[in-house]
């Protein structure tokens, strides 16, 4: 059963007032329009948001733009010739009070200092557009056959594959980097990856680290991805439009969560455990940490399932083990996936 959408709601810096109306800021700037390869001089904040994040349908009202990756965008908006990063806030986002500002706000962000509000570059004009949604846009998350709803909520723009593939090559395949600040980010990634507890794809721990962070970002979780994407300069020659590593990681995470949820749901059907001295997988412990009545039988069976997946990295090979005891018919939520991915990272 799909949860009822509560309005107003933010999606990619657009405020959806109800099923029929959306409001968004537009920026008049030909330089920015050219950077985004648009055919009009007005750039909607949604266009800019998707350009920076690479994702669609994210529940966000603001974006952070790093100089290292998007210096031309920052200069086009502010006239600043160097900084670390800026943010653009389109309104207030909270659980009970979503409001669009009359004009989007610009802030200069510096480490250990409070944000400083900036003025827009001279000659830049902004306006607010209210638009009626066509009937096929009434649902913010359109349904696509044969895909779980969680996998539809956040879509990718083509840029996201390019972003992930570039970071993959820079960090995991150790492409040549001469910048000290970029090398510092790579070193941080390697250090953080050492804490990883479970890998979801066939690759190195560092490769999985990048894919997991990309997936967490897609799910809207606060993590290290924004730093990686913002502080590593984009290199078109390293980008691939056909990269799918993060998609495999995302799907594997979802289906492992459904298995863990199904195991818990059908716990009374699980076989008895003969050896109750086996160690339990740390990711399993973390995943079930907020559940009640989690027996050793659940933990042990789930650990076996996780170990089997690590061995084969193929759900087809898991089915004989699972299907002889329980049904696989319990879905997973975005929160389930975030919890699981964080547990994989050792967080």
UniProtKB/Swiss-Prot annotation:
Pfam families: Herpes_U59. InterPro entries: Herpes_U59/UL88. Belongs to the herpesviridae U59/UL88 family. This is Protein U59. It comes from Human herpesvirus 7 (strain JI). The lineage of its organism: Viruses, Duplodnaviria, Heunggongvirae, Peploviricota, Herviviricetes. The gene is U59.
